[in-house]
């Protein structure tokens, strides 16, 4: 099964609408307050790092999915991402604690290098 590092590079602009119709930034470029590892109580620093205002995966480490502490029902997600050549990642949403892996309970917005990845576009 392909390895997916989910929630890849939650960068600069991520926001959700709360019940008071105010916008809430989930990542401010310097703090992971409000984020944690999937099925964890803390943030997985062994798999993620903050660098130059971006949240990045740590190369060579097993990917640990990150989620918000707060549960959202309606939201608008805006983000920027970078993906290495041949990369395969994604953004999961509406995840639950069901299953051992996040992809067992949540739909995914795929982030894939369609040109270079083996699962990408083909002639």
What residues fall within each predicted segment?
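Sec-dependent N-terminal signal peptides
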Residues: 4-14
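Carbohydrate-interacting regions of secretory-pathway proteins
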Residues: 16-123
